[in-house]
Amino acid sequence: MLCVPRHSNPSGEIYSDENLLELFRIGSQFSDKFLFLFDHAYLIHDFLPSKEQRPLWELAVEAGVEDQTVVTTSFSKVTFGGGGISFYASSGGSLDLIKKVRTTMIICPDKLNQKRHVEFFKDAQGVKDHMQRHAELVRPKFEIAYSYLEKLDEECGNFSRPTGGYFITYSTSKPVASRVVQLCKEMGVLITPAGSTFPKNYDPKDSVIRIAPTYVSKEDLEVAMEVFITAVELAHSEIDI
């Protein structure tokens, strides 16, 4: 099982400790070879007060499934995309397998890059302060996106309100997500293709659209969101279900 347990991409949920322990119970009862893969990409990416979550490894140890668990995270969304430093936790055969695969990919870590990160952050508080500055940049853009999405009639669909991460999910009430994306493109706004968050890019309901408000400037975001809500209204009015 592969999942993003905090600010889950794209809908933003934070898995509760109770649900995580239940996942561990169900998976381990199914098979002692069942593997839990956690992509903790948004571990420290809160931009609003968020639910507390115990460390995943602590929960895995409590459930007795540390040999079946792999927890990974990186600084790709903290410092440089694809150029940060990364971390993982595992145990037993799972750890042995990761070490074997990793050894065939790279001789050793980029120690200069590790040194750069240590010099920049200094300590854990330095990381927290840096992510607070991230939040101050990200939060206003989400607020802009919400202000436009709130203009849409509820019959058109609904949207998520994450407290961290980088994405908003808009779910159309009719199977028109692909049409919305097409209309946006025709009006000069490119957004993530409909279905991108599903296996093989197939959304059986054709309803889920992922919005990433952080990439563009506030000014461009306002234009893009005006285009988006117009596209949703047009697509919704074109089809009767």
Model-flagged regions — what are they?
Residues 1, 9-13, 65, 117, ...:
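A structure-centric feature marking long, well-folded core domains of fungal metabolic enzymes
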Residues 1-51, 239:
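Active-site phosphate-binding strand-loop segment of PLP-dependent enzymes
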Residues 1-2, 72, 86, 117, ...:
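Generic structural signal for small/hydrophobic residues in well-ordered secondary structure
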Residues 34, 69, 157, 189:
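Short, conserved active-site loop motifs that form the nucleotide-linked donor/cofactor pocket
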Residues 61-139:
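Conserved core segment of the aminotransferase class I/II
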Residues 118, 132-146, 156-171, 185:
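Conserved glycine-rich beta-strand-loop-beta hairpin in the small C-terminal domain of fold type I
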Residues 173-177, 216-218:
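Helix N-cap motif at beta-to-alpha junctions
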Residues 186, 200-241:
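PLP-dependent enzyme catalytic core of the Aspartate aminotransferase-like
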